[in-house]
Swiss-Prot record:
Reaction(s) catalysed (UniProt annotation): [protein]-peptidylproline (omega=180) = [protein]-peptidylproline (omega=0)
Source taxon at top rank: Eukaryota
This protein's name: Peptidyl-prolyl cis-trans isomerase-like 3
Record PANTHER family: PEPTIDYL-PROLYL CIS-TRANS ISOMERASE-LIKE 3, PEPTIDYL-PROLYL CIS-TRANS ISOMERASE-RELATED
EC number: 5.2.1.8
Coiled coil feature spans: none
Amino acid sequence: MSVTLHTSLGDIKVEIFCDSVPLASENFLALCASNYYNNTIFHRNIKGFMIQGGDPTNTGRGGESIWKKQFKDEFPSHLKHNTRGILSMANSGPDTNGSQFFITYGKHRSLNKVYTVFGKIIAGIEVLDLMEKVPVDDKDLPLNEIILKSVTIHANPIANQ
């Protein structure tokens, strides 16, 4: 199962791990299908670490899950922050997942069992390279907006349930 994130810097194709992390996958796919992420910005960009988006208020403080409440973390042992291009749920503590997500710029073992991994980049890693080079202010907000214009779902197993 995959989706393409159509950003202002180009397209990133991401494999979604539906079987391994069903809650995070269902939430992300349903939000994508409802155009929830359309025209949102990546509001946090830390070179060497990650880029974060998924907040419809574009402040870094908003967003909610499809269930209108926070949902539990999922930590299968085989999914780790072990390379560049890992897609994970952002949270503010245990079991506080909503709509925000981030993509890693490198391997970060300290994130394992803290943030739910639910996907990885399978095409368009060069777009992630461009994102990492965008200058930021003192709050890690990109000085030139990086916009998630839309998302294309290539196959949605949840739609058939």
